Amino acid sequence: MQTSKEKYFTKQLLNWNKKFNDRKMPWKGIKDPYKIWLSEVILQQTKVEQGIHYYIKFTEKYTNIISLANAKDKEVYKLWEGLGYYNRCKNLLFTARKLRDENAGKFPTNYHEILQLKGIGVYTAAAIASFAFNLPYAVIDGNVYRILARYFGIHTPIDSNEGKKEFTHLANKLLDKRKPAVYNQAIMDFGATVCKPNL
């Protein structure tokens, strides 16, 4: 059960999103789990402005999981060039081929099955589950930690087990279970555009 402060937070965030959030990115509103996954992997350790360019290149060349899975390693690594952290690219290919071989190129629609895929952690699994399948899993990244810590006055270190539990519990309480995709995108955008790190 949400407290009145928690209810107010969720309501105001969704209100801000509806009236003022004009942040545009090519993957916003997309329901294709492949494209959501691709965007999330590209954005790990990469700024959004740079990531957009790579996302467009990848989605134009490899339109679905099977086309990526069938590509030659050398070709994919060449396209990835400049993004660094090549382990991300290696995991991308491994997972694409696993899904091609074991699931006819389809993403699982279950959060826990998504989480089992190589290179996919809790954050990316929640993003895919909520954006593609509208499942009620809160995304929790640096933006979300910062917003919740500031608004709710949480001082528990986020890199501690206690902190992770506290923030995860709160994030899932705040999540609008009827509109998880809308809520998750809203809180990420609010953290990126309004509640910035050095304010």
What do these predicted regions represent?
Residues Q2-K7, Q12-L199:
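Catalytic cores of DNA base-excision repair glycosylases
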